[in-house]
């Protein structure tokens, strides 16, 4: 078997394992890959693969924290069904806060970051289900708030 074919099989197996949404640690992924014939896999290789494919830890149907692949790998757009993932938008006069469904904050933040300063966004910080958005100027907070509400079709 050619080296490229082995790598392709590894990637296929890796993605298939993550789709099962049952692996809570990198060590569990290493063990599963070893068991199906990929002996030269270690934690650092799995870590690089998780980063390469944009895998995130989120809660599965059993509410366990597991690794999974993102729904989309490209830069999300507002035409994506992302608005369904936003639960609440609020601000305190200085910073905007968005609450999302579990595991969705980083995806939403990535889309917001792609809008950038032209839309009044200086930067975002995302956790699992919460995003902080800093406006380009404190005086723009109300305008940014209204824009984000409109973007995700929420009412204030």
Swiss-Prot record:
Alphabetized Pfam families for the sequence: Arg_repressor (PF01316), Arg_repressor_C (PF02863)
Gene3D superfamilies according to UniProt: 3.30.1360.40, Winged helix-like DNA-binding domain superfamily/Winged helix DNA-binding domain (1.10.10.10)
Keywords on record: Amino-acid biosynthesis, Arginine biosynthesis, Cytoplasm, DNA-binding, Repressor, Transcription, Transcription regulation
Protein family according to the UniProt entry: Belongs to the ArgR family.
Stored HAMAP family: Arg_repressor (MF_00173)
Localisation: Cytoplasm
Name of the protein in its database record: Arginine repressor
Upper taxonomic lineage: Bacteria, Pseudomonadati, Pseudomonadota, Gammaproteobacteria, Aeromonadales
NCBIfam families: argR_whole (TIGR01529), PRK05066.1 (NF003457)
């Amino acid at each position: 078997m050619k080296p490229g074919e082995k790598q392709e099989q590894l990637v296929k197996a890796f993605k298939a394992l993550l789709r099962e949404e049952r692996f809570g640690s990198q060590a569990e992924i290493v063990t599963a890959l070893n068991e199906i014939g990929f002996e030269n896999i270690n934690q650092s290789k799995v870590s690089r693969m998780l980063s390469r494919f944009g895998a995130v830890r989120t809660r599965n149907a059993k509410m366990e924290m597991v690794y999974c692949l993102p729904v989309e790998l490209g830069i999300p757009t507002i035409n994506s069904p992302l608005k369904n993932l936003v639960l609440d938008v609020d601000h305190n006069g200085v910073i905007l806060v968005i609450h999302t469904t579990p595991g969705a904050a980083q995806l939403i933040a990535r889309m917001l970051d792609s809008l950038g300063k032209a839309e009044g966004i200086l930067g975002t910080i995302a956790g699992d289900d919460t995003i902080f958005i800093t406006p380009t100027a404190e005086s723009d907070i109300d305008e940014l708030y209204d824009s984000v509400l409109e973007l995700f079709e929420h009412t204030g």
